[in-house]
Amino acid sequence: PTYSVMKDQNKCNNMQHLSKRLNENGYSLQYIHGGDVDFTNQKGFLRSGNFIDIVRDTDFPITDRLSKWGVPDGIMFDYTLNLITSEETLSATQPYFKVLQTLSSHEPFDVPFHCLDDPYCNSAAYTDSCLGAFIDSLKVTPAWDNLLVMILPDHCYAKYPETMQNHELAHFRIPMVWTGGAIKSPRIISTIASQIDISATLLNQMGIDHDDFVFSKDIMDPMLPHFACYSFSDGFGFVTD
């Protein structure tokens, strides 16, 4: 399978969006990315999810666009931190949903940072250091107490280790971390799931109806069948508990 739903605007307009459901329930929306949001119809996809406030590469001076893809993650994390901790945001009564999409760990891995010789590992270490500094800074602000931060990648890097093949299951195994003052207590969940299950899981925790998200399953519901699908250029896979 090589078809991309995001490139089909008609499908984008007629599918369920987590952001749209949150917006319908009173949340303001903002999408933050240091790259080109017109790439592969990303902007069209975001618009169909009710994102109007979209921050992109051209919103930053040319001196900040230091990589092939745009503005490095360090600058973007600092920008997002300033937004969340601003007096305007802290004093606002409307809840918000902000998405920060990173880009520095993408090929060609040209980051303003060096601690490892392997280019990919070095870029991942850079983004990780930026994320860690972001979380550490948030923890000492008033914003942290009621904040939920969700962290997840889209996929692993197919060329690390070098022996990994594009179809291998390990290429699609990714973590998801929830943190923030809104988390009541630590917990590890080993349920098989995929990104499509984020909507039902989050909305159920918030007490928001998600019955029309028919493909999404609540990861925390032990009574549901848990599985995940994945695809690559020449095939697809199915994983269960």
Language-model features: locations:
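Solvent-exposed soluble domains appended to multi-pass membrane proteins
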Residues: P1-D241
